[in-house]
Amino acid sequence: MKFKTALRYRVIYQVRSLAIYFGFYALFGILFPLIGLLFSNDVNTVSSDAVIPCLVFMGILSFLGVNTDFKLFIQNGLSRWTIFLVNFVSNAILSLVGSLAVLVLIKVFSGNFISHFQLSMKLIDVYAQGNFFMSWLLFFILLMLSGSLGLLAGVFNDRIDGVKKLIVLLLLLMIPILLGTIAQLGGAPMRLRMLHILQTMVGYQSTGFTVLPLLLTISCFVGINLGLAYLLNKHREIKIGRAHV
């Protein structure tokens, strides 16, 4: 199996999954609210978020695909580096297509197509200010972040076993406690410094939010997640019961 064949297989699987997702979202995120409006006397506008569910879907899809695809690709002669590239490129393609599809869907419902109902993307609108291409770029990067987290979590879950996995998870859980302790012990200057770092990372200024710092921050996290996933995937083995192949 070559790279193009593996990528085509992966993209077809993901696009089909995306179509299923949109079917469920149309039912629960669009149809149900519309039915509620028909039987309601309330004239307020009903808003359905289109960003968070898509981010969750992307992470879950990436997580689930790691194990099944790895076994299939290894058995068909692909190297671990090629498998990593297939996952990265397919996630990028799905993020690009998925973000565009959601934005088009939002545009359809943003006018007077259906009164008192709209699809929202408040998190993105804070930064993009209605700019379509900036919204597309930011949504794409957010989906890449979710996909990279799912990829890293999937590889970690398959690569690390037993006590090691528990220790790593506990260390991750301790990070907020550690940061909170540092902020308290450091006093007001430390808290202000940490707040300033956070504001810089998310692009908050006195005039409002700017998108470039946030894009850089998310891109860095995507790079870190992908780097860790590659390192974990480098010596990964196929597990059959308790045996390793």
State where each predicted segment sits.
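Helix-loop-helix units of permease transmembrane domains in multi-pass membrane transporters
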Residues: 7, 66-92
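Hydrophobic alpha-helical transmembrane segments of multi-pass membrane transport/permease proteins
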Residues: 16-37, 50-61, 167-180
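Aromatic- and glycine-rich beta-strand/loop motifs that create alpha-glucan
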Residues: 1-19
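Hydrophobic cores of alpha-helical transmembrane segments in multi-pass inner/ER membrane proteins
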Residues: 56-68, 98, 142-149, 217-228
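Membrane-interface helix-boundary motifs at transmembrane edges
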Residues: 74, 78-82, 154-164
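Secretory targeting signals
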Residues: 32-54, 90-160
